[in-house]
């Protein structure tokens, strides 16, 4: 049964790559993140006056699909992770960090690592996706498209899906317990 599950994942990965063009992305993370302990998520909605740069059905569906693929269950009731996104039409200056690859840092378990800030000049058409730890009330991961191949066309659904997939490909953590349960989402999750 476990082999069948592995073959199914490989098949899904192969078919999902059809029509997919990886975009150059960068990501940063918090050394306070509990990346192996998250099970649930929800997408943040802008409060008050609607911010059109934070609302896009194609981006939301792509995020939902990717997070569910990684085994996360969407819930409005005290999710472990809150996911937000923002589309930047204009160029901007952005603060990032020079960090080891996230998998390397998690594997080594170093807690006394210092942040090494870097300034980025991003041109127009940048997509930013952030993951917040609800309990810690802090951003624990952010991924953003870079402008090596030009700006993202926010009116092109295929380009938007590719941008989301490219960004969230850098977040490589399965939901806690997902793999151990053979890829089955737990019916009862503790918050």
Spans of features found by a protein language model:
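C-terminal motif of bacterial Sec signal peptides marking the signal peptidase cleavage site
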Residues: 13-16
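Post-signal peptide N-terminal segment of mature Sec-exported envelope proteins
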Residues: 26-46
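N-terminal segment of the mature soluble domain
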Residues: 40-95
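A short, structured loop/turn motif at beta-sheet edges
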Residues: 35-39, 74-79, 131-139
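C-terminal/domain-edge helix-coil "capping" segments
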Residues: 18-32, 118-126, 133-141, 146-191
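Extracytoplasmic
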Residues: 38, 78-82, 122-127, 155
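Surface-exposed short loop/turn segments
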Residues: 85-140, 146
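Positively charged n-region of N-terminal signal peptides that target proteins for export
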Residues: 1-4, 56
């Amino acid at each position: 049964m476990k082999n069948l599950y592995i073959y199914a994942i490989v098949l899904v990965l192969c078919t999902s790559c059809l029509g997919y063009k990886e975009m150059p992305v960068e990501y940063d993370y918090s050394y306070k993140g509990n990346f192996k302990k998250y099970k649930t998520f929800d997408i943040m909605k802008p409060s008050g006056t609607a911010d059109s740069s934070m609302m896009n059905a194609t981006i939301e569906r792509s995020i939902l699909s990717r997070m569910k693929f990684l085994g996360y269950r969407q819930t409005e009731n005290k999710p472990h992770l809150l996911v937000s996104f923002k589309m930047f039409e204009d160029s901007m200056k952005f603060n990032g960090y020079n960090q080891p690859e996230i998998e390397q840092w998690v594997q080594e378990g170093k807690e006394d690592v210092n942040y090494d800030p870097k300034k980025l000049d991003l041109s127009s058409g940048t997509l930013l996706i952030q993951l917040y730890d609800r309990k810690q009330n802090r951003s624990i991961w952010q991924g953003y498209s870079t402008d090596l191949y030009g700006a993202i066309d926010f009116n092109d659904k295929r380009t938007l899906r590719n941008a989301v997939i490219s960004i969230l490909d850098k977040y490589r953590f399965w939901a806690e317990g997902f793999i151990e349960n053979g890829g089955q989402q737990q019916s009862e999750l503790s918050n």
